[in-house]
């Protein structure tokens, strides 16, 4: 490898919105990374499914087409 052409490789603190944090190494100069999901809270790793706001879509569909249209399927 050539000298003095590679970015600085520093310890980086990664923190998730769930509160979990861990240390890794990265070329990010700030030394901190904020993530929305991590292995502590991601549904694939936890086995739990997050409920998204799909209830509004279903209610809007039923209001528009009625419950009979949904029951025919």
Swiss-Prot record:
PROSITE patterns per record: RIBOSOMAL_L31
Molecular functions per Gene Ontology: metal ion binding; rRNA binding; structural constituent of ribosome
One Gene Ontology cellular component annotation held by this UniProt entry: ribosome
Keywords from the named record: Metal-binding, Ribonucleoprotein, Ribosomal protein, RNA-binding, rRNA-binding, Zinc
GO biological process terms, semicolon-separated: translation
Essential cofactor(s): Zn(2+)
Binding site for Zn(2+): 16, 18, 38, 41
Keyword Transmembrane: no
Note on cofactor: Binds 1 zinc ion per subunit.
Pfam families: Ribosomal_L31
Protein family per UniProt: Belongs to the bacterial ribosomal protein bL31 family. Type A subfamily.
Function description: Binds the 23S rRNA.
Subunit details: Part of the 50S ribosomal subunit.
Name of the featured protein: Large ribosomal subunit protein bL31
Species whose genome carries this gene: Streptomyces avermitilis (strain ATCC 31267 / DSM 46492 / JCM 5070 / NBRC 14893 / NCIMB 12804 / NRRL 8165 / MA-4680)
Organism phylogeny: Bacteria, Bacillati, Actinomycetota, Actinomycetes, Kitasatosporales
Gene for this chain: rpmE
């Amino acid at each position: 490898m050539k000298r003095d052409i590679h970015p600085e490789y520093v310890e980086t603190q990664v923190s998730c919105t769930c509160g979990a944090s861990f240390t890794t190494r990265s070329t990010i100069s700030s030394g901190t990374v904020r993530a929305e999901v991590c292995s502590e809270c991601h549904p694939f790793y936890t086995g739990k499914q997050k409920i998204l706001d799909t209830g509004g879509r279903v209610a809007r569909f039923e209001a528009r087409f009625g419950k009979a249209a949904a029951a025919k399927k």
